[in-house]
Amino acid sequence: MSRVANNRDWADDEDLEDSNELPQSTTTTNKDGTQTIVTWRFNDDGKKVKTTRRIRFTKVKEIVNPRVAERKSWGKFGLSQKDAAGPASDTTSVGENIIFRPSTNWRKDAKEEVSDAGAMKNKLKDKQVKCRICSGEHFTAKCPFKGTMAPLGEEGAVDVAAGHADTPEGPGGLGAGKSSYVPPHLRNGGAAGGERMGGGKFERDDLATLRVTNVSEMAEEQELRDMFERFGRVTRVFLAKDRETGLAKGFAFISFQERSDAAKACEKMDGYGFKHLILRVEFAKKAT
């Protein structure tokens, strides 16, 4: 029996050893500074798989503020003296970790943003600011006549001479011909402005503004002032002009200090010929 045991095939032990154990991992340092690491593992079929990896180590030198590096080397003190290195959850609040996801089409996205901005610029190139009250080239909020006349084309404007609208109000302050909601402050005469303290100066300015239409495009403000000052003191002259050409747009507003002077000018200047055109003069309507 001992002779049979001593005459076993040498491959039997090799197969037995290979089927149960994996060779040890080896790490070899090469002359170029890289390392070759050989590892073994079993795959899903129970076979040995050899993995060889070659690793190159690179040192990255980072330049930081010396003061920052010095603070990082400070030791903990006080109640946290025995704590481990790094931030502790009970004494340090760590900011949210923001995950950065780089985009592969960032150049395309940037071009689209530039093209969109260019298209919007071209779209707004021909747009001009136009006042809804006097059609001048300024914002409606900055119109010098926003308190003395109604927007052009509106039918519900309050006549200056009458002082109130002709449309009667129904029960509850709603319009008789409308079923839309009317805010409380506009019901039962709430829209009418209260009397101003100090006086008549502002009221005279509101009631003594004339609207002059069919004005020649070659007209100037000083010419209009000279014509209307014959009837009384003129406090303000506004002639709407085109911003690009500088020519008049065909209408103007003349404000007198006294309403009687404005009425006299309206009577005399309505139908007056000026630069081959017949002027149309009327009282400006007050905004509601």
UniProtKB/Swiss-Prot annotation:
Family statement drawn from the similarity comment of this UniProt entry: Belongs to the eIF-3 subunit G family.
Domain called RRM: residue spans: 208-286
SMART domains: RRM (SM00360)
Presence of the UniProt keyword Protein biosynthesis in the record: yes
This protein's name: Eukaryotic translation initiation factor 3 subunit G
Protein's UniProt keywords contain Oxidoreductase: no
Function: RNA-binding component of the eukaryotic translation initiation factor 3 (eIF-3) complex, which is involved in protein synthesis of a specialized repertoire of mRNAs and, together with other initiation factors, stimulates binding of mRNA and methionyl-tRNAi to the 40S ribosome. The eIF-3 complex specifically targets and initiates translation of a subset of mRNAs involved in cell proliferation. This subunit can bind 18S rRNA.
InterPro entries per record: eIF3_g (IPR017334), eIF3g_N (IPR024675), eIF3G_RRM (IPR034240), Nucleotide-bd_a/b_plait_sf (IPR012677), RBD_domain_sf (IPR035979), RRM_dom (IPR000504)
GO MF terms held by the record: RNA binding; translation initiation factor activity
GO CC aspect terms: eukaryotic 43S preinitiation complex; eukaryotic 48S preinitiation complex; eukaryotic translation initiation factor 3 complex
Comp. bias intervals (Polar residues): 21-33
Classification via SUPFAM superfamilies: RNA-binding domain, RBD (SSF54928)
Paired cysteines (S-S): none
Assembly: Component of the eukaryotic translation initiation factor 3 (eIF-3) complex.
Subcellular location(s) per record: Cytoplasm
Acidic residues compositional bias, start-end: 11-20
Keywords: Cytoplasm, Initiation factor, Protein biosynthesis, RNA-binding
Matches recorded under HAMAP family: eIF3g (MF_03006)
Annotated segments matching region Disordered: 1-33
Lineage, highest ranks first: Eukaryota, Fungi, Dikarya, Ascomycota, Pezizomycotina
GO biological process, one term: formation of cytoplasmic translation initiation complex
